Amino acid sequence: EFLSIDDLDITDSKAVLNYFNSNKFDFFVNCAAYTNVDKAEGEIELARLINAVGVRNLALSCKDQNATFIQISTDFIFDGKSSIPYTESDLPNPINVYGETKKEGEDEIIKTLNQFYILRTSWLYSEYGHNFLKSMLRIGADKSELDVIFDQIGTPTYAKDLACVILE
């Protein structure tokens, strides 16, 4: 079952508790997040409410049901200064509100649960929705030359591959 904010507001602890009391889970995948990196700088409390408090609400309910929690996180928990890809053993050092609040959410999971997976993705793309690849293809169809940043290192993540990993 896939839920939207209309189905479940993860920032509402009572709503989360009621939802979990009405459903039984072996696994719970959280894709909900405040993801507008730039806007988060001016909406700190909203970003924290969704990315940290909401995650805590879900983690507590997963703990009550002994359900394995799968959290979709981000490479923004790192400072981006490494010249090589990050690994799960690298120490987080977020440099913006988005990264800080996603790290806070990860911390809530780690302190609450024994059964969890945190999947840190970056540059997510697919044939659906809005993403960098689709934007570049669209703009490239209209222009003979594209100006894009070239000082970032990342690992594009195909959404279907990520979904397959989660299902395994």
Predicted regions and their residues:
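SDR active-site strand-loop-helix element
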Residues: 3, 28-32, 69-74, 79, ...
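A short helix->loop->beta-strand "cap" motif at the edges of active sites that frequently abuts
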Residues: 64-68
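A short beta-strand-loop structural module common to alpha/beta enzyme folds
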Residues: 1-8
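Catalytic helix-loop patch of NAD(P)-dependent Rossmann-fold dehydrogenases
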Residues: 42, 49, 54-57, 77-119, ...
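NAD(P)H-binding glycine-rich loop region in Rossmannoid oxidoreductase-like domains
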Residues: 10-50, 63
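NAD(P)-dependent short-chain dehydrogenase/reductase
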Residues: 107-167
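Structural motif corresponding to alpha-helix initiation and N-cap regions
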Residues: 10-13, 34, 52, 91, ...
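Conserved mid-core alpha-helix of short-chain dehydrogenase/reductase
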Residues: 15, 57-61, 108, 161
